[in-house]
């Protein structure tokens, strides 16, 4: 499990008042150098939680360059070793937002065939599905499960194109597949 950082999402009354703040959407480990983070502290970043990298990438996040340095470098290097974090953030932000309409919706996402997608990509059929090992796995909070064949028709891809490029380039995500854990 990972935490995600989209900035401070709560007001002084600890009520969620925004979806995100800024373009830095990162995925962090839950424990790092003894740091503890409260769940809804005003004026501090508000942690959100992800089952694994596939969920985090599909939500538009990238690995943190501090607590997940090796994963961040692998992600970046799989796209372009010369790419700076700020440029990655701008690319992902542009892929998350639909100009004039706000956040991109699942219906706005690109259609790709399953054979064009790398393992670790999340698509939508009758719900979110992880492409892994030549099969689509259904989502649950316990992990990805119930593999089924990849359909021949185009699939709506939730994972942003930049993260698909990282997966295609060799980034190996942490996946929670029921019956296996790949790290």
Describe each region flagged by the PLM.
Residues 1-183:
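Mature, structured domains enriched in cysteine- and short glycine motifs
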């Amino acid at each position: 499990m990972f935490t995600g950082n989209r900035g401070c999402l709560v007001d002084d009354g600890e009520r969620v008042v925004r979806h995100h703040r800024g373009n830095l959407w990162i995925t962090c480990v839950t424990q790092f150098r003894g740091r503890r983070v409260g769940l809804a502290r005003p004026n501090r970043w508000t942690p959100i939680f992800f089952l694994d990298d596939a969920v985090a990438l599909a939500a538009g996040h990238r690995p943190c360059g501090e607590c997940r340095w090796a994963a961040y470098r692998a992600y970046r290097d799989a796209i372009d070793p010369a790419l700076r974090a700020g440029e990655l953030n701008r690319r992902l932000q542009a892929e998350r937002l639909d100009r004039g309409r706000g956040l991109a919706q699942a219906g706005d996402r690109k259609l790709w065939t399953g054979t064009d997608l790398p393992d670790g990509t999340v698509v939508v059929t009758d719900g979110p599905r992880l492409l892994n090992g030549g099969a689509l796995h259904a989502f649950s909070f316990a992990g990805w499960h119930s593999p089924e064949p990849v359909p021949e028709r185009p699939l709506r891809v939730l994972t942003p194109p930049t993260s698909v490029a990282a997966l295609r380039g060799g980034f190996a995500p942490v996946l929670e597949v029921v019956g296996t854990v790949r790290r």
